[in-house]
Regions:
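Short loop/turn microsegments at loop-to-beta-strand junctions
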Residues: 23-24, 48, 123-124
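Extracytoplasmic and endomembrane cell-envelope/extracellular-matrix remodeling and assembly machinery
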Residues: 28-34, 89, 145-147
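Thiol/disulfide oxidoreductase modules built on the thioredoxin-like
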Residues: 96-102, 109-153
């Protein structure tokens, strides 16, 4: 049964990318032809908050001020933030980055590559990675995201 097969696959993906698991890398060609990978940012000795988002997604746009607050508060203390634009047109992503005043790095034009790898079915989906590349927490939003980042940055 294809539906059961799909559900089993989804469970396996979620197990592989659960809290405590090592990050799964991916590489995306950027509009300028360069290639960028998650591993260019994750497992570099810092906590990294990764926001999987799209320009057309209202809740994604609403989360940006919360991410900006964390970036402003903790970036100088060693927190990195990375945006990964999924399911979106390059020009729409670039326009949204300007409109929203996003200053942290972005992997754009990722489409469904990372969402399939991480079993992400809805966005925004925000994952906090530890300095060693393990997943600290998945699907962080609003106050829960702020609390989790504050907790790890105290250590």
């Amino acid at each position: 049964n294809p539906l059961i097969k799909m559900m089993i696959q989804q469970q396996e993906i979620l197990k592989k990318t659960a809290e405590g698991a090592m990050f799964t890398d991916f590489t995306i060609e950027q509009p300028d032809g360069s290639k960028v990978s998650l591993s260019d940012y994750v497992r570099k000795g810092k906590y990294v908050l990764v926001d999987f988002w799209a320009s057309w997604c209202g809740p994604c746009r609403a989360e940006i001020p919360n991410i900006k607050e964390l970036y402003d508060k903790y970036h100088s203390k060693g927190l990195d933030v990375l945006g990964v634009a999924v399911w979106d047109k390059v020009e729409d992503t670039q326009k949204a980055i300007k409109e929203l005043g996003i200053v942290w790095p972005q992997i754009i034009n990722a489409q469904q590559i990372p969402t399939e790898l991480y079993g992400i079915q809805g966005i925004p989906h925000i994952i906090l990675f530890a300095p060693d590349g393990t997943i600290v927490a998945r699907d962080l939003r609003e106050e829960a995201m702020k609390e989790k980042v504050a907790e790890v940055m105290k250590k």
